[in-house]
Regions:
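Nucleotidyltransferase catalytic core that binds NTPs
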Residues: 1-215
């Protein structure tokens, strides 16, 4: 079914840990496309520091030239909150017969019951959970029950059905976080080797994470 990986986030800023996770999942799960969706107004997180259009530009620069990496600006263009269920509904309408795989990290998965209309997500897409090696999935509560009901260890299920499965995959964990990158830049330090050079240059040229913006 030519699965599409959907990788949303604030990307404030995007860095090599994001890109490595996307690349490993693309290779391991045989995803023809990883679509990055920078959030415009994320309802479940603190407001981003950098402007939405600037973060979009960062993602475009970071993914340029990588086969199968694409960027979708629909959430940036929205005036209101960017709910994942709404974005997936739009994508499902556009790709009625395609397998959609929503990529989330471990922390996001554990907070899933707090998401808007979270039980509807699996009606629209598969859920791919990227986690640290050695992490154990919850065995109790709503997420434990959901994993018993919807969990799969078969990559083929992501290709043979449009939605409804949860697949958990261990990825290399680079110890980089957007918060730490912003703090480092705010202290006047160089973020070289934490992100692609084109993203670094844009950040330094715009001073979007200068000390006055992070305190």
């Amino acid at each position: 079914m030519n699965p599409m990986g959907i990788f949303g986030g604030t990307f404030d800023p995007i860095h090599y840990a994001h890109l490595r996770t996307a690349f490993e999942l693309q290779q391991a799960l045989r995803l023809k496309e990883i679509r990055f969706l920078p959030a415009g107004n994320p309802p479940h997180r603190d407001q981003p520091i950098a402007d939405a259009h600037l973060r979009l530009q960062m993602v475009q620069l970071a993914t340029a030239g990588q086969a199968g990496f694409t960027v979708d600006d629909r959430e940036v263009r929205k005036a209101g909150p960017s709910y994942s269920v709404d974005t997936l509904s739009e994508l499902r309408h556009e790709y009625p017969d395609r397998s959609l795989c929503l990529i989330v990290g471990m922390d996001a998965f554990l907070s899933l019951p707090k998401w808007h209309q979270w039980r509807e997500l699996l009606q629209l897409a598969h859920l791919v959970v990227a986690h640290r090696p050695g992490w154990r999935a919850p065995g109790m509560g709503p997420l434990g029950e959901l994993l018993v009901d919807r969990g799969t260890g078969r990559i083929g299920d992501l290709h043979e059905t449009r939605a409804g499965c949860i697949y958990i995959h261990a990825v290399t964990q680079l110890e980089i976080s957007s918060t730490e990158v912003r703090q480092l830049i705010g202290m006047g330090r160089d973020p070289r080797f934490l992100m692609p050079d084109a993203v670094r240059k844009l950040i330094l040229d715009t001073n979007c994470y200068s000390k006055t913006r992070t305190t």
